[in-house]
Amino acid sequence: MGGIFSKGYLPELPNGSLIKLGIIGLENSGKTTLLNKFIDASSKKSIASVLISTGVYIESIIFKGWEIFAGDLLYPNYISKIYKPYLLGSDVIIFMIDSSDIHQMTEAKNQIDLLIQEQCINSSVFLVMANKQDQKRCVSIHQLEQYLELYRLTNPWKCLPLSLIQEKGIEDLIKWILENTVVRKTYNNQLQTLQ
């Protein structure tokens, strides 16, 4: 565990490549922990705390061709007023959920509804990470997909199990991001060529 973690899970992207990645979600869902797993130990001091609005900070870093930000969705208006420019500029949006906290599900659904309503995720791939799948009371992936109504999305999406404590699911999420980001960028480039 320590050897892999110290190097960081994110692979280095080819020269000239850049993937913009946003990690959002409710409090205590694992956003900062995931960010710290992604990067190597020596890069943690390079994480910047950026003030984006009065009293609202995001964590930001560029690492091996990945431009990452992570932030809490504390209030519904954060999406439309504060995070929208960051979300619209992202290739990938990871929405973190504590799958062991049933009370968080309703608020998570409200936030995802708002993301769809505000058209914040139309041009990105969208990944819901059901963290804390190691807990006995966790919600299953199928239950989560149905409750959040993820089938409404027209862009590439996936709901994956994750246990950051056990470091299970991180490699699967990175693999899915890489596969779907390449497909999405190719599709967007083809659309631009036709216009």
UniProtKB/Swiss-Prot annotation:
GO cellular component, as recorded: cytoplasm; trans-Golgi network
Pfam families: Arf (PF00025)
SMART domains: ARF (SM00177)
GO MF term list: GTP binding; GTPase activity
Residues noted as binding GTP in the record, renumbered to the chain: 25-32, 72-76, 131-134
Keywords: GTP-binding, Lipoprotein, Myristate, Nucleotide-binding, Protein transport, Transport
GO terms, biological process: intracellular protein transport; protein localization to Golgi membrane; vesicle-mediated transport
Chain segments annotated as coiled-coil in the UniProt record: none
Family to which this protein belongs: Belongs to the small GTPase superfamily. Arf family.
Function comment: May be involved in trafficking events within the endosomal system.
Name recorded for this polypeptide: ADP-ribosylation factor L
Lineage: Eukaryota, Amoebozoa, Evosea, Eumycetozoa, Dictyostelia
Gene: arrL
